[in-house]
Amino acid sequence: GIVAGVATPALADRVALLSSDLTQRQLLDVLQSQHQVCWGTETLRKTVAAMAEGLSPFGHQAQVAKVLSLLQQAADAGGPRKIQLVVGRDGIMLPIRGLKKYKEGATATVSVYSRWGKRLGTVYLGQMPEELQISLSDELTRLLTDVLGQWNGAPLRLSYITDAGFHPTEYFESVLCRMLDPQRPGGYLEWEWVVDYYHACQYIGDLAQVIFGPGREAYAWAAKMRRTLKEKQGGVFRVLRSAGQLRAIRGLVGEESDYESAYNYLRRHSPWMNYAERRRLRVPIGSGVTEAACKTVFSQRFKCAGMKWGIESGAPILALRVIALSGIWPEVRDAVFDSRTTEIPQLPINSTTQT
């Protein structure tokens, strides 16, 4: 049928896919120059919203199928280690009209790594600014639960790689640590949290500035400690010992509170900073995939020059964008159109003709 009363299914599909990447003005120009379609902004927005509403309910199952397909690909390829399912989440500030308190959009990634430590693919989730990021957490939990419930292959290494911000920490403690193992009734899944190595390095830099002040000494010590943190067993404790000894011997150039803040961050999160062991197992130690998702999901589409968004106007674009970036657009589109196809019943053919 006609989508939103204005577009054929083929045109609506084209508009929806382009809207996930192009600005409104760019898309209207493309429609006019390539398709001889002259629309106004209201018609465009109505079509995009209708397509997002139609596609979104089918996105979840397509993402589940995509992750399961990647897991099977990893299983078929073989290798010396476990297949890895790696999850991350992060946030990015968005230019939202009329919203003073909550402006942080949130994204999550679910990636599959081969037994050799190579990333095979990623699916993306996104949420416009929302208090406590409840919708993103629910969507991510549903995706992980369905994937792990349907996977009957080789055991997986489950990794959660984030910074140690409030939302990532709360999700690990309240959801992942309590996630039941579908293969072991009454048991729990063993998620390994890895605090992003590069965030940890920022705190080493802070310690260097407080201990030495600006200059070569601070740079050299921080570089050495970053290598120690990454390459040595118990690296974080070596860093803490070195910082403590230097403080006792030479005192501090900077503020005591700055030293305590950086030192306590490393000490508090030390159980999730065993980077040498993670590297040995070919587990990623940085949240680069999720950091990049903040840019690909949000920045490249929502933070162009002069842009301001409303929550409701941004949601359809975001829904379409995560479907496109996850590489499941054809599957979702076909599922939508198949669900709306009505077969015309065949009338019985009489063997004799009445006159």
Predicted regions located by residue number:
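Catalytic center-proximal scaffold of phosphoryl-transfer enzymes
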Residues: 1-355
